[in-house]
C-alpha cells in the first residue's frame, strides 16, 4: 500500500499524505491480530499506522519501544510520535526500525533543530524503493504556538495535542478549534500551508470530527475510537465518510 510514496520528494510525500486523513493508533488494538487488521486496512486503502512511544518520564505511561516499529507490516506507513525524555537515541532507533514519519515534542527535545536536520537526511524503505523520512513536531495543549516558527522550514508535520500526554484532561472543543485555526493562520502567513501536514491527536470522537476537519486539519490520529466494539473496518468507514463530507 505504500508503493506510491517510492521515489517522491518531501513536498510530493506531504501532498500524498494529505490523501490519507486517518492515522490509526495501532496500539489500541490487539497486537496478535495485526494480520487481520492489515486485511481491513488494505481493503479500505488506509496505510498509515500511528505509534506512540512513551517512556514513563515525559508522561506517566509506558507503551512500546522502537522494536515495535519493525514488527509492523512492511506495506504500512509508520507514523511514530515520540514522548520520551531522552529523544535522540530513540529517534535514531526509530528510523533504523523503519519509521516513515517521526514526530517530536517541542517541550522536551534539546537540540531540536539538530535532530530535525538529521532526520532530513534520512530515508525510509517503502515497497519499490525509498521515501524521505517526514519530520514532525507536536505541541501540548498549553504550549505557545510560536514554538513552531523557529523550525517551520525544517518540518513536514505539525501536530496539535488535544490532551495532555498520559492524562485525561482535554481541550474543550472550542479551544481545540481555535488552536487549529491559529496554526492554519500561522502556516498561511509563513507561506507553508501546502508544504506542511496539520494533524490533531488526542481522544477525538466522531461527533467533533466535522468541525475539526472544517477548521483546516489534514489528518486526525485515533486509536480507541476506531477499535471500539471490535469493529475496526466499520468504524474507519464511518470516520472516512464524515471526514470527506466535512471537506
Where are these regions (language model features)?
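Alpha/beta catalytic cores of nucleotide-metabolism and tRNA/nucleoside-modifying enzymes
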Residues: 2-9, 185-200, 205-247
Amino acid at each position: 500500500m505504500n508503493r506510491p510514496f517510492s521515489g517522491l520528494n518531501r513536498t510530493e510525500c506531504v501532498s500524498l499524505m494529505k490523501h490519507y486523513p486517518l492515522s490509526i493508533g495501532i496500539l489500541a488494538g490487539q497486537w496478535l491480530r495485526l494480520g487481520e487488521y492489515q486485511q481491513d486496512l488494505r481493503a479500505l486503502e488506509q496505510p498509515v499506522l500511528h505509534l506512540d512511544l512513551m517512556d514513563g518520564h515525559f508522561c506517566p505511561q509506558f507503551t512500546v519501544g522502537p522494536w515495535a516499529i519493525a514488527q509492523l507490516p512492511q506495506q504500512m506507513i509508520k507514523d511514530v510520535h515520540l514522548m520520551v525524555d531522552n529523544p535522540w537515541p530513540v529517534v535514531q532507533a526509530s528510523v533504523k526500525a523503519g519509521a516513515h514519519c517521526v514526530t517530536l515534542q517541542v517541550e522536551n527535545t534539546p537540540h531540536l533543530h539538530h535532530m530535525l536536520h538529521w532526520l532530513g537526511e534520512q530515508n525510509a524503505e517503502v515497497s519499490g524503493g525509498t521515501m524521505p523520512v517526514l519530520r514532525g513536531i507536536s505541541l501540548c495543549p498549553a504550549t505557545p504556538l510560536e514554538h513552531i516558527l523557529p523550525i517551520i522550514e525544517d518540518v513536514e508535520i505539525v501536530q496539535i495535542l488535544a490532551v495532555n500526554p498520559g492524562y485525561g484532561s482535554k481541550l474543550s472543543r472550542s479551544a481545540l478549534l481555535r488552536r487549529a485555526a491559529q496554526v492554519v493562520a500561522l502556516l498561511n502567513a509563513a507561506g507553508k500551508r501546502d508544504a506542511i501536514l496539520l494533524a490533531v491527536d488526542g481522544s477525538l470522537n466522531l461527533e467533533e470530527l466535522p468541525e475539526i476537519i472544517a477548521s483546516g486539519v489534514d489528518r486526525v490520529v485515533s486509536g480507541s475510537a476506531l477499535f471500539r466494539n471490535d469493529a475496526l473496518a466499520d468504524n474507519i468507514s464511518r470516520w472516512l465518510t464524515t471526514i470527506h463530507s466535512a471537506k
